[in-house]
Regions:
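FAD-site-proximal beta/loop scaffold in flavoenzymes
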Residues: 1, 135, 140, 152-208
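Beta1/beta-strand and adjacent pyrophosphate-binding region of the FAD-binding site
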Residues: 2-12
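Short SAM/SAH-binding signature in class I
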Residues: 5, 126, 169-170
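Gly/Ser/Thr-rich beta-alpha loop segments that engage phosphate groups in nucleotides
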Residues: 12-14, 56, 178
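Dinucleotide-binding/catalytic capping subdomain of oxidoreductase cores
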Residues: 16, 20-162, 196-197
Length: 208
C-alpha cells in the first residue's frame, strides 16, 4: 500500500468493505478480528484516494444502507459523489425501499461541503457509469483505462465511446465470482451459479 490511489471495481457491499478497510484508523479496528500484521500495513498505508467504479448508475447499486452509511462516519475519510451522476430525485420514489435509502446516502455524500472534506486525509470517490477496459503499466499497475457508459431504455449499460484513464497503483476487483459446476447438480451457466430457489437446489440439497 505504498501508492496514493487505489481503484475498486464493483458497486456492491464487498467494494464498500474494501474501501472501509483501506480507510480506517487503527483505533477503528478495535474489537475486530483483523490480524496485527495486516493492521501494521494499513496503519502505514500511503493511500489518499480510493475510487469505486460502477458501470451503471446510483439507482442500480447493490449496496445496502447500513454499510453505505458507515462511510460518513469514518475518522479520516470522506465519501465523494458527483451530483451530475445522480438521477432526478423524483425518480427515487420508484425504487425498492432499501435501495431508495442507499441512494439517499449518496445524495447526502454529494452535499458534503468541500471545507469538511479538506480535514480528511482520504477521499472515497464514487465513479458511476464507468467500466474498466484495461489495466496498464510497465511491470506493475500504473493506470486503469475506463470507458464512460450510459443506460439504454432497458437499463443496460452501453458505451458512450468516451474513455479516460485513472492513475493508480492498485486495482481490486469486487464483481463477484463464478461457482464451478458439479455433475448432476442443476446449474445456471449464464449466471455462473447453482439453480436454486431461496437457496434450495433440490430436496435435501441447498446452497448459500
Amino acid at each position: 500500500l505504498d501508492g496514493r490511489h487505489v481503484v475498486i471495481v464493483g458497486n456492491g457491499n464487498v467494494a464498500l468493505d474494501v474501501a472501509r478497510i483501506l480507510s480506517k484508523t487503527r483505533a477503528e479496528f478495535d474489537g475486530s478480528d483483523i490480524v496485527s500484521h495486516a493492521l501494521d500495513v494499513l496503519e502505514h498505508s500511503a493511500v489518499e484516494d480510493i475510487t469505486i467504479l460502477g458501470r451503471r448508475g446510483p439507482h442500480q447499486i447493490a449496496m445496502t444502507p447500513k454499510e453505505l452509511g458507515e462511510l460518513a462516519h469514518l475518522q479520516r475519510a470522506t465519501p465523494r459523489v458527483d451530483r451530475d451522476d445522480l438521477p432526478d430525485i423524483g425518480e427515487d420514489a420508484l425504487l425498492e425501499p432499501g435501495i431508495r435509502k442507499s441512494v439517499t446516502h449518496l445524495r447526502e455524500f454529494a452535499a458534503i461541503p468541500e471545507a469538511f472534506r479538506a480535514d480528511k486525509a482520504i477521499s472515497i470517490n464514487f465513479d458511476f457509469f464507468a467500466a474498466p477496459v484495461a489495466i496498464e503499466g510497465d511491470g506493475k499497475v500504473q493506470r486503469v483505462r475506463v470507458e464512460r457508459m450510459r443506460l439504454d431504455d432497458q437499463y443496460r449499460s452501453i458505451s458512450t465511446g468516451e474513455s479516460y484513464t485513472i492513475d493508480c497503483s492498485m486495482v481490486i476487483s469486487c464483481i463477484g465470482y463464478q461457482t464451478p459446476s458439479i455433475d448432476g447438480v442443476p446449474y445456471e451457466h449464464g449466471r455462473g451459479r447453482f439453480a436454486n430457489l431461496d437457496g434450495r437446489i433440490l430436496p435435501g440439497l441447498y446452497c448459500v
